Amino acid sequence: MSFVRVCSVGDVAAGGVLAVDIDGPNGVGIAVVRDGDDWYAIDDECSHAAVPLSEGDVSGCEIECWMHGSRFDLRTGKPTGPPATEPVPIYPTKVDGEDVLVDLTTTLND
């Protein structure tokens, strides 16, 4: 695994989401979500409408797309509400001190 720093713990409020664009060969746009002490990194593009998930609402372990209301489980990337039917990639995430780290070379839901 190859973790990279994506933000500081203080950058994301509890129950909040932060859009992060990562440059480089594995560069992607991700949504970093904080649910209490749990952290998640999910691809920042709805599999239904191709709009940023980071602009949607977070409730528990789900993020809702602002456009059509598709919901995705932050732990699995699977859609939990229509109209989306395809999952979105999720990435290993950990906290080291005040740094939030994500491994973009591995997806947890292949």
Q: What is the role of each PLM region?
A:
Residues 71:
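Short helix-to-coil "ATP-lid" hinge immediately C-terminal to the conserved N-box Asn in the Bergerat
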Residues 60-66, 79-88:
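Short cysteine/histidine-rich metal-coordination sites, predominantly Zn2+-binding motifs
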Residues 46, 65-68:
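Short cysteine clusters
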Residues 1-60, 74, 90-110:
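N-terminal pre-ligand scaffold of iron-sulfur
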